[in-house]
Amino acid sequence: MLPWFKNWFNSPYYHHLYFNRDEKEAAEFINKLIDHLHPLQGSRMLDVACGKGRHSLQLSGKGFDVTGIDLSEDSIKEALQYETETLHFYQHDMRLPCWINFFDYAFNFFTSFGYFNTQRENDNSIRTIAQSLKPKGIFVLDYLNVHYAEDHMVHQSEKEIDGVNFLITKWYDEQHFFKKIMIEDEQLKEPLVFTEKVSKFSLGDFTDMFAYQGMQIKEVFGDYNFKNYHVKKSPRLVMIAEKIK
């Protein structure tokens, strides 16, 4: 049986549901992040879990050499339309090694982590990213803030997008957040159901995972405007780490 994310991320309904999700906010966050980091022109950047490549394209347009990787073959096929001499895309599983000491920066945006069943798989993913960075390379991971997500969870919601109905149910246990999505479409004989599962990783968890792979967190922010991180009040957990080994 395939893991949930392989089926869901390759589903046309996934892209239908999330296509326009906060794109303006995402683009503004990336602009502010680049202003904060001050990368040199031509810096090599790795966009981990790049999806269809829209954010990789934005980074490339700022004068950087960008490589995007994603597990979804369909997403990468679509991203390939943007390829240039300084923008590259590959279908790749972040749990498996790739480049070694190659990139100046690596990014994992918008909670594109924490999907795997075992801690070994999570550690392997962080290892892949750490190994891909040059010494002193920078890794930015943007994750949900567990405590905020618990306190502000909307347990039931419904969305209608272009005639497709999405019934969304959210809950959590001690280790994971769950999101069940029931899809009703006239073209379907019966509703489709997908369930997302994301690990409840704290700042302490990431600190340990990064340290194990030779990276150290240097800065932490609590939203896309780079406000200070507050364990209960911040909607996001944005970590900037440096490869120190």
Where are these regions (language model features)?
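Class I SAM-dependent methyltransferase SAM/SAH-binding core
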Residues: 54-96
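C-terminal lobe and adjacent flexible extensions of AdoMet/dcAdoMet transferase-like proteins
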Residues: 203-245
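SAM-dependent methyltransferase
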Residues: 140-209
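A short SAM/SAH-binding and catalytic strip from SAM-dependent methyltransferases
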Residues: 104-120
